[in-house]
Amino acid sequence: MIIVKSEREIELMRRAGKITAAARALAGEMVKPGVTTQEIDRAVEHFIRKQGAVPSFLHFPGPPGVRAFPGSVCASVNDEIIHGIPGPRVLQEGDIVSIDVGAYIGGYHGDCAATFPCGKVSPEAQNLIDVTRQSFFEGIKFAKEGCRLYDISAAIQGYAESHGCSIVREYVGHGIGTEMHESPEIPNYGHPGRGPRLLRGMT
């Protein structure tokens, strides 16, 4: 079930979102040759806690038989696709690094991600970053009342594929609120006009 939030709930979510966005920006500034993903993780955790929030990802439970997530950020380098565990890996010139950050405050979560170039990257890597970012904004255009859920998915897929990129189909976006992962699941591919109709207050 997709939870529709009140204006007050969305204001509380904004607080978490602003902390999360600032933490992601800090992480992005640290993506430089010679820095480890663990150093980024520790700096982000310190920043989030300084704001009075708690890192959403730290000790997030995994599926049965998988240990809880050990970091405050997901740091995925080059061909790693999401949920990369921060550690002693030293970033190199030309790497691209996806940073995913979450913060919890006042009963609500914030969650955001972005991919950053480490120093000078290849034209192909920069194109991937640029197309991915714009695909996100193409999807956002349809995240409004009256659209269908898969209008978002189709816009992302259409832009990415029309610019020579492909879609990762094994992972999806998700709703958020008092829980880190709420309904609905939002794939990055699909047919427009399908899925639930979006209502004001869905997050």
Protein language model features and the residues they cover:
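Active-site neighborhoods and metal-handling regions in enzymes and metal-associated proteins
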Residues: 1-203
